[in-house]
Amino acid sequence: MGTKWSKSSLVGWPEVRRRIREAPTAAEGVGEVSKDLERHGAITSRNTPETNQTLAWLEEMDNEEVGFPVRPQVPTRPMTYKAAFDLSHFLKEKGGLEGLVYSRRRQEILDLWVYHTQGFFPDWQNYTTGPGTRFPLCFGWCFKLVPLTEEQVEQANEGDNNCLLHPICQHGMEDEDKEVLVWRFDSRLALRHIAREQHPEYYKD
């Protein structure tokens, strides 16, 4: 019986079906805009700069000089487990993040760079609360934030070459728990979603 969906229409369908199945889904722990991008392929009207902090921040960055364009050169998409995992290993191999003192501004620069070059909407790099080690909410991201001891902070502050505005000289002023945090790579974070185990309440829709 002839219908629009005849056998000839199914040519190539197995490949399309495979691609649909393999299409990456947003990683657990991403923000509301990334969930929109996964579900609808676009940012919906429920997320605006007035209702979403990350969108408001991106709008603000448009008007600020940050050293590179803040408009993505590729389509905006949600961070996936595989992309977070690959990015973690790329940054570990290239160096620059491991052991770097964390600050909100440094996170913003990293988020903007990833958004600009890869298109991943910058609501994926969030961490559990302190005190102590902060684990990433986004499953696949293998960098956690680890507090330095007072002795480590004092050693890092020795000498005359320290800038007062450097995050380590702020002695944790930016942190609610007054801890100086550094990024640390931990490959186990790709296997165990520690943030979800410790804080299941963060993952309720």
Curated annotation (Swiss-Prot):
Region: Mediates dimerization, Nef-PTE1 interaction, residue numbers: 108-124
Top-level taxon: Viruses
Renumbered ranges of motif PxxP: 72-75
GO terms of biological process kind: symbiont-mediated suppression of host antigen processing and presentation of peptide antigen via MHC class I; symbiont-mediated suppression of host antigen processing and presentation of peptide antigen via MHC class II; symbiont-mediated suppression of host autophagy
Annotated region (SH3-binding), positions in chain: 69-78
InterPro entries, sorted: HIV-1_Nef_anchor_sf, HIV-1_Nef_core_sf, HIV_Nef
Motif Dileucine internalization motif: where in chain: 164-165
Keyword Secreted: yes
Compartments, record wording: Host cell membrane; Virion; Secreted; Host Golgi apparatus membrane
Motif (Diacidic): 174-175
Expression triggers: Expressed early in the viral replication cycle.
Keyword Zinc-finger: no
UniProt keywords, alphabetically: AIDS, Apoptosis, Early protein, Host cell membrane, Host Golgi apparatus, Host membrane, Host-virus interaction, Inhibition of host adaptive immune response by virus, Inhibition of host autophagy by virus, Inhibition of host MHC class I molecule presentation by virus, Inhibition of host MHC class II molecule presentation by virus, Lipoprotein, Membrane, Myristate, Phosphoprotein, Secreted, SH3-binding, Viral immunoevasion, Virion, Virulence
Lipidation (N-myristoyl glycine): 2
Note: HIV-1 lineages are divided in three main groups, M (for Major), O (for Outlier), and N (for New, or Non-M, Non-O). The vast majority of strains found worldwide belong to the group M. Group O seems to be endemic to and largely confined to Cameroon and neighboring countries in West Central Africa, where these viruses represent a small minority of HIV-1 strains. The group N is represented by a limited number of isolates from Cameroonian persons. The group M is further subdivided in 9 clades or subtypes (A to D, F to H, J and K).
HAMAP family: NEF_HIV
Function: Factor of infectivity and pathogenicity, required for optimal virus replication. Alters numerous pathways of T-lymphocyte function and down-regulates immunity surface molecules in order to evade host defense and increase viral infectivity. Alters the functionality of other immunity cells, like dendritic cells, monocytes/macrophages and NK cells.
Domain notes: The N-terminal domain is composed of the N-myristoyl glycine and of a cluster of positively charged amino acids. It is required for inner plasma membrane targeting of Nef and virion incorporation, and thereby for infectivity. This domain is also involved in binding to TP53. The SH3-binding domain constituted of PxxP motifs mediates binding to several Src family proteins thereby regulating their tyrosine kinase activity. The same motifs also mediates the association with MAPK3, PI3-kinase and TCR-zeta.
Protein name: Protein Nef
Protein species of origin: Simian immunodeficiency virus (isolate CPZ GAB1) (SIV-cpz)
Gene, per the UniProt record: nef
